[in-house]
Amino acid sequence: MVKVSAENFLYFAISVLVNLLFLKILYIYLFLPNISPPQAFTPLSVKIEEIKAPPKKPGKPQKKVVKKKPEAVSVSQAPEKGDVPVEVKEEKEVSLLPELEKKIKERLKKRKEVKQIGEISAVVSKQKVEIRLGSRKLVHVPPPPVFHVKEYPSLVRIKIWVNPEGRVIRAIIIQRSGVTEVDEGLLRFTKKLKFEPIEVPEVQEGVITFTFST
């Protein structure tokens, strides 16, 4: 009995191994990718041939075209010691000096023709101020000042500066009468004077001498 069971067990074990081996072969055949054996590289054959140029046809010889390079511009330099002096042509520049000199002379001529206002004499009375004109005419004379004094002084001298438009831009008393009311009143009167305009752009000076008549 023991011998029969041992043989049966041995057959069973062998059948199991055979089945496992068969299953493994089947698995490899069905599921694993087919791996092709490496192929041997075939040698490449290279053939070198010499290509000959076709023979040239007889004809006229072609001329070579040569491009001319731009000539370099020569710059003349000042001659140094020991060098041969070279004449340098300078361009004549148009000078504006003659025109400027002409304009300056014209302005100076106009200034000489237009004299300063110079000395002006004026006589002050109770009703009016009579002005004896100098070299420049008056176009406006304000009303005469009114003084509340018992006696008029001898004279008052006022220096004036007049612009080209004819307005008195500055006035100062150079000789006072001694009466403040008279001096200040004549100064205000003088600043309101207006002379004729001139074309020359300059300020003219003059002196007005006021005297009084009763």
Curated annotation (Swiss-Prot):
Subcellular location: Membrane
Main location, first listed in the record: membrane
GO CC, alphabetical: membrane
UniProt topology in membrane: Single-pass membrane protein
Coiled coil (UniProt feature): none
Transmembrane annotation, as ranges: 9-31
Region (Disordered): 53-74
Keyword Phosphoprotein (UniProt): no
Positions with biased composition (Basic residues): 54-67
Alphabetic keyword roster: Membrane, Transmembrane, Transmembrane helix
Database matches in NCBIfam families: tonB_Cterm
Protein name: Uncharacterized protein aq_1982
Naturally occurring in which organism (per UniProt): Aquifex aeolicus (strain VF5)
Upper lineage: Bacteria, Pseudomonadati, Aquificota, Aquificia, Aquificales
